[in-house]
């Protein structure tokens, strides 16, 4: 098993963890219905960029 030679400083630990944060999902509002959905995904009622592309949950 590998054992570290010297202890890492809090600064180096923070530098390593600097890319570990999570980003919030980007949201869009549908033009016709005003419903909020994830970007580049269809909304729950089946609309994408103002067009009906599939049957939604309510249909």
From Swiss-Prot:
One of the GO BP terms on file: translation
**Pfam families cross-referenced by the UniProt entry:** Ribosomal_L32p
Q: Which GO terms describe its molecular function?
A: structural constituent of ribosome
Quote the biased-composition stretches of kind Polar residues, using this chain's numbering.
Answer: 23-34
GO cellular component labels: large ribosomal subunit
Q: InterPro entries attached here?
A: Ribosomal_bL32, Ribosomal_bL32_bact, Ribosomal_zn-bd
User: What residue spans carry the region label Disordered?
Assistant: 1-59
Against NCBIfam families, the record matches this protein to: rpmF_bact
Know the name of this protein?
Answer: Large ribosomal subunit protein bL32
Organism taxonomic ancestry: Bacteria, Pseudomonadati, Pseudomonadota, Gammaproteobacteria, Chromatiales
């Amino acid at each position: 098993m590998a054992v570290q030679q010297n202890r890492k400083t809090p600064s180096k630990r923070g530098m390593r963890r600097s890319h570990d944060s999570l980003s919030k999902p980007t949201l869009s509002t549908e033009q016709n219905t005003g419903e909020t959905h994830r970007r580049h995904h269809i909304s729950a009622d089946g609309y994408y960029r103002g067009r009906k592309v599939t049957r939604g949950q309510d249909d």
